[in-house]
Each structure stands twice: as C-alpha cells, then as structure tokens.
C-alpha cells in the first residue's frame, strides 16, 4: 500500500513539473498577484459541468492556502449571484 501511495505522489509531482510555463501562465500569475495581493480582491472561478467542478476545486484549493477565492456558477450568476463580485475581483 505504501508503494502505491508513493507512486501516486511521484506521478502527481511529475505532472506539476510538466506544467508548461508560458507567457499566458506568467500573465495569469501576475494578474492574480495584482488583483488579490495588491488590490485586496478575490479570485473568482466559474464553469459548468466538468469545467465547473475543476473551477470549484481551484477556488477551494486557493481558499485553503489563504487566498480569497469563490466559485461562481454561470447560471446562478444570471439570477442574482453576481452580487458576490466586488470592484477589485
């Protein structure tokens, strides 16, 4: 069992190492730093279906690391949930 857990962790670590650091990636990181840390906004993720599940996971992961984040479901946004957004988000 320990071996399978170690193998899983090694695969996950390799997957993180394989993330390409492109200009788009760097711009996304800069935007997050600017809006959240300098302007005191929060990260807002959104999506439906599988993309929504991933967006929700991203928001909860950022929250657990102390970065203000919220998931906004697109259909709920049209019915009043846009109120969660503030100026620096």
PLM segments and residue spans:
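Conserved N-terminal alpha-helical segment that immediately precedes and caps sugar-phosphate-binding
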Residues: 1-89
